[in-house]
Amino acid sequence: MRNIALKLMYNGTAYHGWQMQRTEASVQETLQRGLSMVCGERVRLTGVGRTDAGVHAERYVANFRTSSRIPIDRLPFAVTTPTPEDIVVREALEVADDFNAIGSCLKKEYTYRIYNSRIKNPFYVNRAYFYPKKLDEAVMDAAARAFEGTHDFRAVRSVGTETKTTVRTVHYCRVTRRGELLELKVCADGFLYNMVRAITGTVLYAAEGKLTAEDIPKILDSGDRTLAGPTVPPGGLYMTRLWYEDERLND
C-alpha cells in the first residue's frame, strides 16, 4: 500500500469543518469521495487538524493509503474534476509508511484576520471579521505576546473536545496591520478547541480597554474562561503554515 500525503487549501465557508459529519457536508468527506473515484477504491483521509465550521486553510496536509497505481504527479489534476472548486489539492507526495498527517506534525500556525474599517467590504464576508471601530495594533500586539510560552490554556478554550492536557507551548503570537486588514498570527505545538478565536477575542478586549496585557498571565493562571474575551466568529480564521520533518510538506 502506498502512503500518500496531500497538500491542500480550501475555503471552509460551505463546510461544517474538516471532520466527517452525519448530516452536514465536511471537507474530509467531500475530498474522500473524489479521491475514491480517482483511485477506484474507498480511501480514508487523516487530516492535520479539525478545523471548525467556516474555518479556512491556506495550508493543510492530509494523508491516505491506497493500492492505486495512479502516477503521483497526476493525482492533483485527476481529483479536480470530482471535487468542488473550493477545495484544491496543490500537490501529492509519496511519504514514509509511518507518516501520519496529525501525528507527524511538529507545529502549526493559524492566522485570524480582522477587517478594521468603518465601511464593510463585500469581498471579506466570511473571510475576515468586520470590526468598525479603530483598533490600535500596538496595544493588540502587546496583548498577543502575553500568550507566548508554555501555559495551561484552559481559560481560552471552549468545552467540546476532550484532551489529556490543556498545556500548550505558543512559539509566537503577534498582531500586524496591512492597511485596513489586521492579522493575528499564532504558532504552537498544538491548539485547544476554539483557542485561537478565544485568544483573538481577548486581544480585542485589550484594544477596547476591557483588560490589559498585564492581566493575561493572571487570566491564564486562573483557568477561568469567563475572564477572557469572547470567541470571535470562524470566518476570519485560517490555517496558514505547518511544520514537518519531511521538509517537502513545509511550503
Language-model features, listed with the residues they occupy:
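Structured-RNA-binding interfaces characteristic of tRNA pseudouridine synthases
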Residues: M1-D251
